[in-house]
């Protein structure tokens, strides 16, 4: 578990986010951990962000201001 001070917007989402993180790391061939490079870890974090934005856009569908 991460020691991040960031609060989750949805309580209980941590396990789903962790699962996504490890799936993406496996897809990218990245071993997560203290000995991983910042670039490798960052690539996983960037992909998580892209996928979460995509999921949110799909859920919002045709919503416009």
From Swiss-Prot:
| Recorded GO MF terms | double-stranded DNA binding
The record's Pfam families line, in alphabetical order, gives: SASP
In chain numbering, where does the site feature Cleavage fall? 23-24
Which Gene Ontology terms describe the biological processes this protein takes part in? DNA topological change; sporulation resulting in formation of a cellular spore
Q: Which UniProt keywords apply?
A: DNA-binding, Sporulation
- Return the PROSITE patterns for the record: SASP_1, SASP_2
The cross-references to PANTHER family, in alphabetical order and at most eight, read: SMALL, ACID-SOLUBLE SPORE PROTEIN A
Protein family membership: Belongs to the alpha/beta-type SASP family.
Other facts: SASP are degraded in the first minutes of spore germination and provide amino acids for both new protein synthesis and metabolism.
Its biological function? SASP are bound to spore DNA. They are double-stranded DNA-binding proteins that cause DNA to change to an a-like conformation. They protect the DNA backbone from chemical and enzymatic cleavage and are thus involved in dormant spore's high resistance to UV light.
Q: What is this protein called?
A: Small, acid-soluble spore protein 2
Question: Which species is this record about?
Answer: Bacillus cereus
